């Protein structure tokens, strides 16, 4: 089983696993540490996500009602790409999430909003470390079994922070008049004064559509879903399409890549600097193309699902 989110999302299954000694792979090394602490009976290993490749695409048939033909995908030349910058992912309005908190009693509301404000101020801290600190501040010493249940019960905090920063990054670019093509649902619900610069496709999209959008872009923007020692597949998918990956960082990414060599990092803490960074990148397409090509070489050699499958097989035959 590959846990594609923090283990707190899977507490009920992990506490009573459906298969004895179920083997678990986590996509973030902090998630691995969390598993070893709170679910020590389950074998767990680190397995970073990989990128998705477009192998073929359908060319529409000139005859109405007929299926198109499958053709091998060809890389779109960097200078001829349709989009300057794309983001692939849905948006959940944070106001909707806050309403759930507002339904709680006054004491709980204060507790939850203190956590949210602390996470906004310290986005480098993992969700479980932040939640544990606030739980212990409120309740003192708590046994690990009770602590893991309490953390799992606050999954909405993680969802809130993902949505908050996703919205803030897109809004930051739009309000500086930098057009961003977003592929995903609900972006019209983002509280932003510059919606003309958020070009929406208006619906949920599948992985193939996401990869195709990234393949036709010069820059693929990533906002990490609170992975502090792992990565999201958007990073490697961009690299495999010869597209520059622009992402907030993590310890794992810093260990494996160099800023402005195979990708470009920005800071959530200093997101006000992002618009100027994007403008400078778009002014230097040749440099962007060089970074994208180095990213491709790295990803195709080490970060495809074929290589991840080989790693799993090697682990299973140990």
List where the protein language model places each region.
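Cationic, low-complexity basic patches in intrinsically disordered or flexible, solvent-exposed regions
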Residues: 71-73
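Active-site proximal beta-strand in glycosyltransferases
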Residues: 1-6, 23-26, 49
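Active-site donor-binding loop signature of nucleotide-sugar glycosyltransferases
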Residues: 4, 49, 90, 267-268
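A conserved, positively charged/aromatic
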Residues: 12-25
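Catalytic binding pocket for nucleotide-activated donors in carbohydrate/polymer assembly enzymes
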Residues: 17-19, 34-40, 61, 78, ...
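Nucleotide-sugar donor-binding catalytic core of glycosyltransferases
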Residues: 38-60, 77-228, 250-253
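A short, active-site helix/loop in glycosyltransferases that binds the activated sugar's phosphate group
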Residues: 24-42
